[in-house]
Amino acid sequence: MYLSKRTYVKRWDHQKPESRHEVIVNRGGKPRGDIDSSRISEVIEEVMYWRKANAIHSWFVQNVQDGVDDCKEYWVGEEKLQELIDLCSKVVETKDTTLLPPQTGFFFGSQEADDWYFIDLADTVKNLTKELELCRNTKSSGDFYYQASW
């Protein structure tokens, strides 16, 4: 399960030099010949990766995907990410797993609120808090997308 961030970086002739982006893709310290950097219009970053974090996946299905679990990509607003941070923080602090219960499914791994469950929640809080702070501090952010993959 992935949370990615897409940032628009298209260079336009009408932009002031200080507003233009430059993205260069190197391999082995040299620019790749098969990628024209002037045509790059978007940068996609992997913000989070969860492996078998079924409670978090269920949260996205219920709160972002309108209950539809179809492995498609869904846009996630920053306010929703903050809701997830707040919820995960509360569960880690109180150990009340009824707030974000583990889910069943053949592809989901453990349905116990074990050490891995709490590690996933703590990692989610740490990484998403850092990402949202970065967005706020730079006053620029991209668009976030969640996608499950089995």
Regions found by a protein language model. Give the residues of each.
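Acidic (Asp/Glu-rich) sequence patches and key acidic residues
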Residues: M1-W150
